[in-house]
Swiss-Prot record:
Gene3D superfamilies: 2.40.50.120, Tissue inhibitor of metalloproteinase-1. Chain B, domain 1. This is Metalloproteinase inhibitor 3. The lineage of its organism: Eukaryota, Metazoa, Chordata, Craniata, Vertebrata. It comes from Rattus norvegicus (Rat). Interacts with EFEMP1. Interacts with KDR. Mediates a variety of processes including matrix regulation and turnover, inflammation, and angiogenesis, through reversible inhibition of zinc protease superfamily enzymes, primarily matrix metalloproteinases (MMPs). Regulates extracellular matrix (ECM) remodeling through inhibition of matrix metalloproteinases (MMP) including MMP-1, MMP-2, MMP-3, MMP-7, MMP-9, MMP-13, MMP-14 and MMP-15. Additionally, modulates the processing of amyloid precursor protein (APP) and apolipoprotein E receptor ApoER2 by inhibiting two alpha-secretases ADAM10 and ADAM17. One of its GO terms (molecular function) is zinc ion binding. Its main location: secreted. Disulfide bonds join 24-91, 26-118, 36-143, 145-192, 150-155, 163-184. PROSITE patterns: NTR, TIMP. InterPro entries: Netrin_domain, TIMP, TIMP-like_OB-fold, TIMP_C, TIMP_CS. It is found in: Secreted, Extracellular space, Extracellular matrix. Residues 24-27, 88-89 are annotated as: Involved in metalloproteinase-binding. Residues 24-143 form the NTR domain.
Amino acid sequence: MTPWLGLVVLLSCWSLGHWGTEACTCSPSHPQDAFCNSDIVIRAKVVGKKLVKEGPFGTLVYTIKQMKMYRGFSKMPHVQYIHTEASESLCGLKLEVNKYQYLLTGRVYEGKMYTGLCNFVERWDHLTLSQRKGLNYRYHLGCNCKIKSCYYLPCFVTSKKECLWTDMLSNFGYPGYQSKHYACIRQKGGYCSWYRGWAPPDKSISNATDP
């Protein structure tokens, strides 16, 4: 078993990604949670890949050109390679080579960065302006807050440190408006509430603060 296989279960508990393929099952997570729970968060372009004979299905090793690091300076100040399972059924991630810039999140294990389908991985040009601003500073400000998922009504916050995440209840589904345009940030008095960045107001979001 590869080190990555041992990480799959852990990663699927906290990170954002795509709904599972076959045996790969991922719980939805707000981008802020994915940011705060990741060892590494970077913007990078994939410039190469190779299949390493490791484990039952092998491991894909992507060579990347790191553009910017948002989180993880103390763990790995510069990332040159990322590792993922070769099989999508084991949450392996497929990335285009020499085509797009990506936002990549992942864990560090034995000096290597691992990522997969259950991590928050997205093409950079698909991120909203609010998400980009979140990566630069807003998400970091909210790492002491807790985003509470709401899958069905009624649901309530039970602590002043919680923000209620209701994207899963909307007609647009997940990822929704709160994922794309809001960060959960501590306000005066120690309360956490949704903070809207550069996005049109959505009156359905409660306890939101304008810039």
